[in-house]
């Protein structure tokens, strides 16, 4: 795998994940209590023995840069690296990234200097575990110019993805990005060609691109240089290339979830608490998901009732009830609280007991969840200060609302409390 260079696309402004992306790049969004989204593709690369990794981003890169610098510091004796390349304006190109392909094109001058055979293009907002070695091996065996990782998919979600048709050899012969209506119907195929049973094929009659590609180095350089107006892999580069290049499909048959929206992100996090087997586990001895070592103390539970939940390290919980929830590192929950079906991202720092008491004495609200508060079906971003006897329950069953001045948004019926927000005592949302 020394001849492979990985390029992780950090995505655009993250509007679908807003307000979680208000103060951070999409790959830096916390997930599963202690990780960040970027940890997933980077860990997959490391476990696949791919150690040359670039992350392309253009919005709010500071926390992403900090996380990567603290986490993925390879020894000076190896040529491995994880490096963030932020969008930049130059005299030759005064524009920001215009799309996924344009992001790679703008750094092509640097990427093409590497002595590699393939470029592996990955997305920064997917939850999955994959051995890219098998993917690249298939690419080489079929002498493909481009190989796409694909999954079979059902009618309900098909129009959200790039869909394709393949021949018996696995070659892509038609590709359509997010088709609707009649165009969608035309992309139905017999997915038994991927190895599905007739029953599975009947319920999943489409072949969807996961947004994970491997290109021959010279093919990618040629495609990007000869068509400067094409800015997106899924919409333009791949459909056009499938007409006159050997574009192959590689079936990925394990758990994979695109968590680029608030609802999908919320559901994927809470699914980690499912019994008896969650659809995805961050623990795998053979292929761990890495993140920054924080050296926090174990979590302290004082007379708490906790069911079907994940609790990060360094938390302090007092006489509360936690059900079907995920609590991030350094979460602090006071007496009498009820947390149900919620994702709490925790805090970036501890407040000492003396400091907390001083805050309370001055009438300020300390970081964490105050006494007798009820939180249900919500996402609480980092460092939120939630007061005494607050109810975050979406009492009016609102589906969408922008209340930034009050410290929260509602997306798909899920209340999202902003990072560093202050919710005063007695507030009912």
UniProtKB/Swiss-Prot annotation:
GO terms for biological process: glycogen biosynthetic process. Pathway: Glycan biosynthesis; glycogen biosynthesis. Alpha-D-glucose 1-phosphate binds at residues 162, 177-178, 209. GO terms for cellular component: carboxysome. PROSITE patterns: ADP_GLC_PYROPHOSPH_1, ADP_GLC_PYROPHOSPH_2, ADP_GLC_PYROPHOSPH_3. Signal peptide: none annotated. It comes from the Bacteria. Its EC number is 2.7.7.27. GO terms for molecular function: ATP binding; glucose-1-phosphate adenylyltransferase activity; structural constituent of carboxysome shell. InterPro entries: ADP-Glc_PPase, ADP_Glu_pyroP_CS, GlgC_bac, NTP_transferase_dom, Nucleotide-diphossugar_trans, Trimer_LpxA-like_sf. It is an enzyme of class 2 (transferase). It catalyses: alpha-D-glucose 1-phosphate + ATP + H(+) = ADP-alpha-D-glucose + diphosphate. Keywords: ATP-binding, Carbohydrate metabolism, Glycogen biosynthesis, Glycogen metabolism, Nucleotide-binding, Nucleotidyltransferase, Transferase. Belongs to the bacterial/plant glucose-1-phosphate adenylyltransferase family. Homotetramer. Involved in the biosynthesis of ADP-glucose, a building block required for the elongation reactions to produce glycogen. Catalyzes the reaction between ATP and alpha-D-glucose 1-phosphate (G1P) to produce pyrophosphate and ADP-Glc. This is Glucose-1-phosphate adenylyltransferase. The gene is glgC.
């Amino acid at each position: 795998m020394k001849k492979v260079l990985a390029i992780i696309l950090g995505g655009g402004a993250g509007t679908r994940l807003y307000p979680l992306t208000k103060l951070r790049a999409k790959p830096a969004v916390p997930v599963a209590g202690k990780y960040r989204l970027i940890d997933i593709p980077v860990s997959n690369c490391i476990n696949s023995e791919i150690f040359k990794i670039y992350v392309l981003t253009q919005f709010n890169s500071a926390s992403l840069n900090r996380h990567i610098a603290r986490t993925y510091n390879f020894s000076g004796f190896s040529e491995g690296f994880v490096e963030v390349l932020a969008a930049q304006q130059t005299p030759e190109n005064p524009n920001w990234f215009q799309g996924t392909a344009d992001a790679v094109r703008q750094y092509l001058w640097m990427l093409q200097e590497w002595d590699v055979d393939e470029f592996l293009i990955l997305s920064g907002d997917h939850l999955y575990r994959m051995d890219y070695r098998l993917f690249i091996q298939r690419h080489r065996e079929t002498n493909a110019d481009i190989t796409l990782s694909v999954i079979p998919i059902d009618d309900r979600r098909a129009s959200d993805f790039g869909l394709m048709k393949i021949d018996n050899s696995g070659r892509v012969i038609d590709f359509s990005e997010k088709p609707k209506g009649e165009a969608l119907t035309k992309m139905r195929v017999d997915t038994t060609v991927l190895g599905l049973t007739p029953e599975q094929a009947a319920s999943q009659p489409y072949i969807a691109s996961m947004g994970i590609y491997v290109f021959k180095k010279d093919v990618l350089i040629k495609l990007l240089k000869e068509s400067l107006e094409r800015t997106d892999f899924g919409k333009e580069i791949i459909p056009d290339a499938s007409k006159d290049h050997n574009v192959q499909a590689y079936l990925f048959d394990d758990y994979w979830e695109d968590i680029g929206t608030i609802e999908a992100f919320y559901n994927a996090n809470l699914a980690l608490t499912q019994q008896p087997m969650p659809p995805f586990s961050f623990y795998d001895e053979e292929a761990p998901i890495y993140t920054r070592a924080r050296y926090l103390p174990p979590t302290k539970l004082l007379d708490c009732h906790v069911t079907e939940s994940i609790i990060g390290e360094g938390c302090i919980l007092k006489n509360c009830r936690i059900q079907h929830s995920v609590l991030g590192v350094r979460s602090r929950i006071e007496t009498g609280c009820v947390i149900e079906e919620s994702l709490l991202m925790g805090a970036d720092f501890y407040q000492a007991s003396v400091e907390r008491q001083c805050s309370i004495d001055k009438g300020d609200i300390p970081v964490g969840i105050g006494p007798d508060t009820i939180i249900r079906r919500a996402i609480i971003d980092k460092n939120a200060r939630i007061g005494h006897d607050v109810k975050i329950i979406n009492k009016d069953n609102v589906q969408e609302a922008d209340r930034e001045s009050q410290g929260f948004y509602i997306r798909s019926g899920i209340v999202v409390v902003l990072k560093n927000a202050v919710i005063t005592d007695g507030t009912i949302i």
